[in-house]
């Protein structure tokens, strides 16, 4: 699936992406892991961003987690075809929606319980949060450093970047930022389109079938393109 066009369509159509371009079968998109902050300070953004995660999760290899004071895997909840039903399931299962924020604790739980399974094959991790955090900033820095070592690319999406006066000076954001490959906004269609372009431009993984074909060519004295 052509990721950038899928993401743009999802953003513009409120989560539905029906018109898709197909990418080459010889390469595969990197898996995406979404860690979405659903704490009280993110109330005005959470639904919009979960709609977006729902849309790309139906078309791409995506694992999605929600966090506030605890981490909850919601991948299976977002697979429901109807977005309103999917979000109702999320609201019923994620018991700390609208609560405080413990980003470091959420990352620790993710890396202890889920990272080995979902960070293979050069995954790209998207953390969606405003960076307001009640935890220990030093712990957050350590967890971010560990996460960065485990993934292909670590991207932080902060909806507050849509404001021209915003500065990432909270303790949590300041601790996390040095470990991010990219620091982007997530407040508008245009911001999500920029994210789609970034992800679409990342080097793809060569599929197993393509590697097998390349090996066959090499065995017969041919040359395969990388």
Locate the predicted segments by residue.
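Cofactor-binding loop segments of dinucleotide-utilizing enzymes, especially the Rossmann-like FAD-
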Residues: 67-69, 130, 159
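Metal-dependent catalytic core segments for phosphate chemistry
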Residues: 44-47, 51-102
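A short alpha/beta connector and helix-capping loop motif
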Residues: 28-35, 45-65, 124-128, 140-153, ...
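Negatively charged sequence features
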Residues: 1-30
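Short acidic, Gly/Ser-rich segments with clustered Asp/Glu that frequently serve as metal-coordination loops
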Residues: 33-47, 71, 132-135
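Exposed acidic/Ser/Thr-rich ligand/metal-binding surfaces
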Residues: 104-153, 184, 194, 198-207
